[in-house]
Amino acid sequence: MRIFALVLATLAALCSVASAAEHAATKQVVFVCEHGNVKSLMAASYFNQLAAQRGLPFHAVSRGSAPDSTTVPKPIVAGLHADGVDVSDFHPSKVAAADVVDAARVVTIGTELPANAAAEETHVERWDDVPPASTSYDAARSSLKAHVAELLDRLTAE
């Protein structure tokens, strides 16, 4: 019985070490749009889906340069839900220096990074060609999914 307990304790310790190493190896990508609750949220959601499907060590977050709401518009919640993503509990937050300082990539979508969130060593790119989701969810979705797939291809090649 004692040996069994020792084996279980050893396995538990190894699993937690592996989990910590796996978490440390995950690279963060930050998507930033003006309000942080539409384009950046869609991009982060599609990015996380595709990274998981490909088994890649990346995780994305959504931030806003000037969030003005605490919720996500219902059409966006519904559209992402149809794509298998639940954002019903998501609350937009403003991008901060802590978000971008260690990010593998920062992607601005139709906005600028606030001065207090700029980081010297951060790889920043702009996606200014994404159509408004309020005009056409499908067009925004297609544009973002294409950008996300291309970004993941580039990140895995680096």
Predicted regions and their residues:
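A structural micro-motif
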Residues: L56-F58, A104, T122
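A short, aliphatic-rich alpha-helical micro-motif
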Residues: V100-V101
